[in-house]
Amino acid sequence: MRQLADPVRKMGLFNLFGKKDVSEIVNNSPFKLSTVWIPYTLYANRNGSCTLSVKLKNVTEEPLLTSIVVELPQSLGFDKTGMTKQREVRIGEMGAGEEKEVGVEVFGGLKSDSGEYTVMLTAIAHYRDYGHVINAVKKRTSLKVV
């Protein structure tokens, strides 16, 4: 399996002219991802919100078209009604070594009981447009509801 994968990458499967080596992006993690909740807790069974601050750094030598997907559990939402559970933030092209910070507001409501909720983050490196994916980095973070 390893012998077949290397020649395909060297052919530049993702490049229009077939000359670009993308093995570094495919094999290694292209991003450094860190998160902070502001404030760090949310109140149970009350309408309220907090902001998920996401810092994303491109650690490759090339610019990457980047987006972040945030997925919430059932009792939280991205709007006051709590209906939206997934959001994609299109960051655009990040240069080599560039760092960007994105804030996403998360709402709790009357159905959010106390406990710890897991939020999934996925940072995606795209090629050409947002429909083609080269690599992705996933991270879980938890929000405490008291």
Residue ranges with predicted function:
Residues 46-61:
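Short beta-strand elements of extracellular/lumenal beta-sandwich folds
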Residues 61-78:
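Short acidic, flexible loop segments centered on an aromatic residue
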Residues 101-106:
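Exposed aromatic-hydrophobic patches
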Residues 90-100:
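Short proline/glycine- and polar residue-rich coil/turn motifs
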Residues 75-90:
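Short beta-strand and strand-turn-strand segments in soluble, beta-rich domains
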Residues 108-146:
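Terminal connector regions
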Residues 50-52, 100, 117-119:
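Hydrophobic core residues within well-ordered beta-strands of beta-rich domains
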Residues 11-45, 146:
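Low-complexity, acidic Ser/Thr/Pro/Gly-rich terminal tails and inter-domain linkers that flank the onset
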